[in-house]
Amino acid sequence: MEKQTLETKKIVHNNISYLQYDLAKDQAKTSFFDISDINTIKDLRQEGLQKMHFLNLYSIFWFYSGEGTHIVDFDEYEIGQGTVFFLSPKRIRAYRNLNNVDGIAMCFPEDFLLKIDNELQGRIKTKMFYPANGFAHCKISEAAKEKMKPIVKLMQEASALQYEDKSLQASYFASLLSLLLIDMIRLGEWGDSSFSNVSSDSFQVYAKFVQMVEDNYIEHHAVKD
């Protein structure tokens, strides 16, 4: 797959400066999908990763190993083995103190998601990109990672190839992404992990309230056939 170059623009808002990454206007947004090694991104955009920035794209960062801090909308999250972050477009983020990291990163536009089945697309958006608590991340165990590695390998192999039919290639990537995200939903350690390590006190109060409502609903509403 031909590697696409993201355009970079410096934005200043309320005396805060950050970088904006977006697809070039002449790039086909329905067929764009990129999967890259995290270390490759780190080497190419070392300074950009440390500065506050956002993508006008959906992105997934899966850290196989390493440590550091991921800042999302000014809240800090710990990076550890198996951590996966799911970011919707325009989430402001930065990385600090990345050490011995290894993993993959994927990004794709809104139009690419339209290639995924409507029902599954809704589940993916609600669970991963627009959850009630505002930001989602999970842990993938080594055993679960081994089960997902064949899908990731197929994505990486397809990314290295040139396809004349870009639409067919995009559909193939959408199918593989669907399988990968389904496995992450099934095998990932979610729990209330999306609520932890957020530095904002008000956010923690909100998170506990959401958890109490969900627990109370489950306790008082039996599932009926």
Sequence positions of predicted segments:
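A hydrophobic/aromatic-rich effector-binding and dimerization subdomain
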Residues: 2-11, 16-27, 97-163, 190
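Short acidic-glycine-tyrosine-enriched beta hairpin
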Residues: 74-88
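Generic protein-terminus/edge-of-domain signal
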Residues: 1-71, 75-77
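Short, Lys/Arg-enriched, Trp-marked, Pro/Gly-tolerant hinge/linker segments that flank
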Residues: 142, 162-172, 184-224
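Short, charged/polar surface micro-motifs in flexible loops or helix N-caps
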Residues: 41, 65-67, 90-92, 110-114
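Amphipathic, well-ordered alpha-helical segments in soluble domains
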Residues: 59, 147-154, 176, 180-183
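Short beta-strand His + acidic residue motifs that chelate non-heme Fe in jelly-roll/DSBH
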Residues: 69-71, 87, 93-98, 104
